[in-house]
Amino acid sequence: MDVFMKGLSKAKEGVVAAAEKTKQGVAEAAGKTKEGVLYVGSRTKEGVVHGVTTVAEKTKEQVSNVGGAVVTGVTAVAQKTVEGAGNIAAATGLVKKDQLAKQNEEGFLQEGMVNNTGAAVDPDNEAYEMPPEEEYQDYEPEA
């Protein structure tokens, strides 16, 4: 149980770092979130490790795609990763779901809320849009 909580704590640090910083925080948050999820994954049953590693990699990819975009989107991505790791741990019997709910009451971010302030967010909200490819131009420096 302590291992799982330590992993979630590291992932939470990543979420907090993203909320406090902009572009620099995004990269740091991705690393810390991945570190926390991998920590949990390395301590769970062998068959689950691959799944947790995949979740961590996808989170890192999503955060990289966000770049300097709105931090709320990054927070939602990181929060979903933490929730996914919790669900994996609960499914393997590492922790009980009621223990996860208790941790949420003690300070972990609630789904759909920003830093437990009561400000609602849409976790499925795409905080950025990629422009159509025809808007891109190749740049060739002058010689």
Swiss-Prot record:
GO cellular component: actin cytoskeleton; axon terminus; cell cortex; cytosol; extracellular space; growth cone; inclusion body; mitochondrion
BP terms from Gene Ontology: adult locomotory behavior; cellular response to copper ion; cellular response to oxidative stress; dopamine biosynthetic process; excitatory postsynaptic potential; fatty acid metabolic process; long-term synaptic potentiation; microglial cell activation
Tissues in which the UniProt entry reports expression: Brain.
Keyword Cytoplasm included in the entry's annotation: yes
Listed SUPFAM superfamilies: Synuclein
Positions that bind Cu cation: D2, H50
General function of this protein: May be involved in the regulation of dopamine release and transport. May be involved in neuronal plasticity.
Name of the protein in its database record: Alpha-synuclein
Name of the encoding gene: SNCA
